[in-house]
Design a protein with these regions (language model features):
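CheY-like receiver
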Residues: 41-127
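Residue-level detector of beta-strand face positions
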Residues: 129-131
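Conserved small/polar residues in nucleotide/adenosyl-binding loops
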Residues: 134-136
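Non-catalytic signal-transmission and effector/linker regions of two-component phosphorelay proteins
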Residues: 1-4
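Two-component/phosphorelay signaling modules centered on CheY-like receiver
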Residues: 10-34, 74
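Conserved acidic carboxylate
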Residues: 7
């Protein structure tokens, strides 16, 4: 599973990359990720680079994570999006962009890993179907 992680805070990115590395070491060695410090760079990369999951901070300068999700949904209605934020204020709005989950910071393994486990299981169960479409 390939993840795009987008957060403007270097501190949060350090914490999240530590958690993703821990997840890779303890649960799924095939997990990979790319890091983005703003939504503009993420939006420019998505059309040319495949991601299986997006982890988006909501409150970022410029294009917010919610704005990025709206733009992504115009061309990709299926990619799972998990919002990571320190505010519960946008939880209801996250349903409008079909978010897979909404996690409040600070994150730890107890919050993040069960969500990743579920999405990874969904991803793996859909993989044979996706591969069959590629070979058609």
């Amino acid at each position: 599973m390939h993840i795009a992680l987008c957060d403007d805070s270097r501190t949060e990115l350090s914490r999240l990359t530590f958690l993703l590395e821990e997840y890779r070491l303890t649960r799924d060695g095939s997990l990979t990720y790319d890091i983005f410090t703003n939504a503009t760079d993420l939006l420019e990369t998505i059309p040319v680079h495949h991601f299986d999951l997006l982890l988006l901070d909501i409150l970022m300068p410029g294009i917010t994570g919610m704005d990025a999700a709206r733009e992504i949904r115009q061309t990709n209605s299926t990619i799972p999006i998990i919002f990571l934020t320190s505010s519960s204020e946008y939880a209801v709005e996250s349903y409008r962009v079909n978010a897979a989950d909404y996690l409040l910071k600070p994150l730890d393994a107890d919050k993040l890993f069960p969500v990743l486990d579920k999405l990874l299981a969904d991803f793996k169960s859909n993989a044979p179907y996706i591969l069959s479409l590629i070979h058609i």
